[in-house]
């Protein structure tokens, strides 16, 4: 741990001790430490509220999607999940009206031209912990195609979001959570062979929004060498330089396989890679452009753009004799169609699906058979026994997802999102690592930043002081499938009512006091403590374990935040009942009554 960190923590930990017969028995955390703990608790509350809002928004989008299907032309309605899209979207590859369908011939991503607003409606930005890492291409309402190497060491979907394209009039881009990440099973991180990944969005893209999908190739044919194609992204303006704040575009010619092999050597695999650019250099993609599109125009009455390559790697940026390398999309078209059309029983449910599934062991949720069907594929028993087995395995996996999500969430809050983006060896066309933030109380020694999880929302529930406003439900008459979605919406609203109804001005957690028993040290160096905290007008007291050394305190903070959330949840569930001054009778007996706003330890 850095010396500056130790000094900071030692200053914050100036103890307020109480003694008996000259020997300290109890100590209080300093006001500075309580202030930092309160700030982290407030961040946890804010993240939980955002997650709850996203969960409701996603179901509302599903309801709108179902209504759109019901109101469309009469056609058989598939029983596939709502997040599943046909592999070939309608009106793909078309730019918005008023936006020219040409890319500047002399533009450069490395130091060059800014693309007009809305010129790349299929271009998206993949964000890890809220920080941009790679580009991507929208290929269907719920699917983004990108480079597999973007997820090296960070393949948990809970960490990722996708920023969609802005509109032609500068409309604000929409941020969407990621439901599933599917790297190609044969991706080789050493050679970048098969460098392709599909990302399933948690919320389908609205057909009325500014984002539009690109067209996928219809067959195995590619444009001939010399064809001018287009690239775009937010990548670095020069090698190892800063990223661009706006989308930049360039037009580059496709090069023949022989030329690519000659200039790039054995690192190029012509079977799955193609290259494009100028042998004289100067125009190329760069760090941060990974996963972005290489598109070529398809002539016709209504010209459209077709995706033929995904930005993969390169030796430098815009250097002479070193064109950029792109993964061939035509080679993987069958795999893409298979993944995007797969039914729910063919793959394990994602953590995000399970964390938003309000199942109970004694009262299974109505969509359990579809969500858990994957686990019943090889069951040889009766239908009912297989359903029970699938539900049990679903619940077990959800518990693991909850533990991972909660633990890594709080660790991520304590370290800060920027810690997720340390140097990542092996990325040839990856994003340059941002500078580390200054050391703070959130530092956790020995923890691998790639294993962190951002806050995805704890399953806290209850009520706030306000009466919940009923959601207006769309008309369900004559549209099958809406009633289960409305039931799902109501269940999510009940589960998250407490956090959803906290007014913004009250969304702050305050730790008033942490009183540690110096005679209760555990083998891990933690001490039993009693914590007094507040949220708005609510006051709770609960027990926990706290460290009094810099390193042990940092490790004990996540658990304290979890216990605080649980305590406020319990308090909200018992609202209206006579409130005891303590959470738990044993704590009240040990501590006695509250006097003058402080926890008073018993003195022998």
From Swiss-Prot:
GO terms for molecular function: serine-type endopeptidase activity. It is found in: Endoplasmic reticulum membrane. One of its GO terms (biological process) is camera-type eye development. One of its GO terms (cellular component) is endoplasmic reticulum. Residues 109-341 form the Peptidase S1 domain. Residues 1-22 form the signal peptide. It is an enzyme of class 3 (hydrolase). The active site is at residues 149, 195, 290. Its main location: endoplasmic reticulum. Disruption phenotype: Mice display the glaucoma-relevant mutant 4 (Grm4) phenotype, with angle-closure glaucoma and eyes having short axial length. High intraocular pressure (IOP) in mutant eyes increases with age and the anterior chambers become enlarged in some eyes at around 3 months of age. Eye's angles are not occluded with abnormal tissue (synechia) and have detectable trabecular meshwork and Schlemm's canal (2 important drainage structures). However, compromised aqueous humor drainage (outflow) contributes to the IOP elevation. It holds the Pfam family Trypsin. Residues 70-94, 424-452, 578-604 are annotated as: Disordered. Belongs to the peptidase S1 family. Serine protease required during eye development. This is Serine protease 56. It comes from Mus musculus (Mouse). The lineage of its organism: Eukaryota, Metazoa, Chordata, Craniata, Vertebrata. The gene is Prss56.
């Amino acid at each position: 741990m850095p010396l500056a960190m130790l000094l900071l923590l030692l200053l914050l930990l100036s103890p307020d001790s109480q003694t008996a017969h000259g020997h300290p028995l109890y100590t209080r955390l300093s006001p500075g430490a309580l202030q930092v703990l309160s700030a982290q608790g407030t961040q946890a509350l804010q993240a939980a509220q955002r997650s709850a809002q996203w969960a409701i928004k996603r179901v509302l989008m599903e309801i709108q999607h179902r209504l759109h299907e019901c109101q469309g032309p009469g056609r058989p309605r598939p029983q596939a999940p709502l997040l599943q899209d046909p592999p070939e979207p309608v009106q793909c590859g078309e730019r918005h009206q008023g936006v020219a369908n040409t890319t500047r011939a002399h533009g450069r991503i490395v130091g060059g031209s800014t693309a007009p607003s809305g010129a790349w409606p299929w271009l998206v930005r993949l964000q890890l912990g809220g920080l941009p890492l790679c580009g991507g291409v929208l290929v269907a309402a719920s699917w983004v195609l990108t480079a597999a190497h973007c997820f090296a060491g960070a393949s948990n979907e809970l960490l990722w979001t996708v920023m969609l394209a802005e509109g032609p009039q500068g409309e604000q881009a929409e941020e969407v959570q990621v439901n599933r990440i599917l790297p190609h099973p044969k991706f080789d991180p050493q050679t970048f062979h098969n460098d392709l990944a599909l990302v399933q969005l948690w919320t389908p893209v609205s057909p009325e929004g500014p984002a539009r999908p690109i067209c996928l190739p219809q067959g195995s044919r590619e444009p001939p060498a010399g064809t001018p194609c287009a690239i775009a992204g937010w990548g670095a303006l020069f090698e190892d330089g800063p990223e661009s704040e706006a989308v930049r575009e360039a037009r580059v010619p496709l090069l023949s396989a022989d030329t690519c092999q000659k200039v790039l050597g054995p690192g190029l695999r012509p079977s799955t890679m193609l290259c494009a650019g100028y042998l004289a250099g100067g125009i190329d993609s760069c760090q941060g452009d990974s996963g972005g599109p290489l598109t070529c125009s398809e002539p016709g009455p209504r010209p459209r753009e077709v995706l033929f390559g995904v930005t993969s790697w390169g030796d430098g940026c815009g250097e002479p004799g070193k064109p950029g390398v792109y993964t061939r999309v035509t080679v993987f078209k069958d795999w893409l169609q298979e993944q995007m059309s797969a039914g729910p029983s063919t793959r394990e449910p994602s953590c995000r699906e399970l964390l938003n599934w309000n199942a109970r062991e004694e009262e299974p949720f109505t969509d359990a058979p579809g969500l858990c069907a994957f686990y019943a594929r090889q069951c040889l028993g009766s239908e009912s026994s297989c359903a029970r087995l699938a539900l049990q395995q679903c619940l077990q996996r959800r518990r693991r997802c909850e533990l991972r999500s909660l633990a890594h969430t709080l660790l991520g809050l304590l370290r800060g999102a920027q810690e997720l983006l340390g140097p990542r060896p092996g990325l040839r066309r990856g994003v340059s690592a941002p500078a580390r933030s200054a050391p703070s109380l959130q530092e956790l020694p020995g923890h691998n930043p790639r294993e962190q999880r951002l806050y995805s929302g704890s399953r806290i529930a209850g009520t706030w002081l306000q009466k919940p406003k009923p959601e207006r439900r769309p008309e369900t008459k004559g549209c099958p499938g809406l009633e289960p979605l409305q039931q799902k919406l109501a269940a999510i609203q009940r589960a998250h009512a407490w956090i959803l109804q906290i007014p913004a001005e009250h969304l702050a957690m305050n730790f008033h006091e942490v009183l540690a028993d110096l005679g209760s040290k555990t083998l891990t160096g933690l001490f039993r403590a009693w914590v007094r905290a507040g949220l708005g007008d609510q006051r709770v007291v609960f027990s926990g374990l706290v460290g009094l050394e810099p390193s042990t305190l940092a490790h004990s903070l996540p658990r304290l935040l979890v216990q605080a959330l649980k305590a406020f949840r319990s308090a909200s569930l018992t609202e209206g009942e006579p409130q005891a001054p303590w959470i738990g009778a044993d704590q009240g007996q040990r501590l006695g009554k509250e006097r003058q706003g402080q926890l008073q330890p018993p003195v022998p």
